[in-house]
Structures are given as C-alpha cells and as structure tokens.
Amino acid sequence: MRKPMKDLPVRRSYFSEKMKGVEIFSEEWGDMVCACHRFAKGVDFTPHLVGQPDDLCPVPHYGYCFRGVFHVRYKDGHEEVVRAGDVFYVPPAHTLWVDEDTELIEFSPLNMMSEGEKVAQTTLGSK
C-alpha cells in the first residue's frame, strides 16, 4: 500500500478541532494509523491529555520529523528533543510540545489511537 503524503485526507479529531495550530492528515492502514501532522509554534498537548492514564499520551508513535523541533517529556520526567531529519520512537506515557512550526509523519497502533481519542473526547470534549 502506498499513497502520496499530499493525498492523505484531513482528519477531524478532538486534537485538530480543539487545539489551535494542529493539522492532521491521516488514514487507517490495517491495524495502524499513518498520520502527517503540522504543529504551529507554541502547540502544547499537555493540557489536552488530562484524563488519559497519568494525564499522558498512552499511544506509542514511530515516525520522522521533516521540519522543526518537538520536545517530549516522559512519565519519569526525562525529556528528549526531536529535530528535523530525526527518525523517532516515542513510547507510551509522554507529552509533547513545539517551540517552532513543525511537520512530521508518524505511524501508531489504530486501536490505541482510537481509545486515546475516545478518552479525550469524553473527558475534554466540551472544553
């Protein structure tokens, strides 16, 4: 299976609808989600993860950063910085924020993404 990234459909989700500066283009492929993200400078997922286990993202993400920089903080408190040109694996129990416009592609398990989206919609959907 293949598709030009520019042909991935816009994904409407809690995060793209409720967070300013978040654009998501994604498609479900088998048991994975292939998603291209554009995050504007200043995007911070931390307040939008309230209600998830430990108030952190429970989903693992594998990907590549095309442009920009993003920061990841894990449950144990350590932080990593992912820069343009880096491939990455971000395990469950993390938060993410960006200090500059950032674009990346990620691949994540569909069932875990669906559950995380459901929790966000249930706990934060009206905010």
Which ranges hold each PLM region?
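A short, polar/proline- and glycine-enriched secondary-structure boundary/capping micro-motif
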Residues: T46-H48, R83-A84, E115-V119
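Acidic/histidine-enriched, glycine/proline-rich intrinsically disordered or flexible terminal extensions
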Residues: M113-K127
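Conserved hydrophobic/aromatic beta-strand scaffold that supports enzyme active sites
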Residues: I24-S26, C36, Y62, E79, ...
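Short, conserved beta-strand element in jelly-roll/cupin
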Residues: D55-V72
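Vicinal oxygen chelate
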Residues: H48-P58, E80, T123
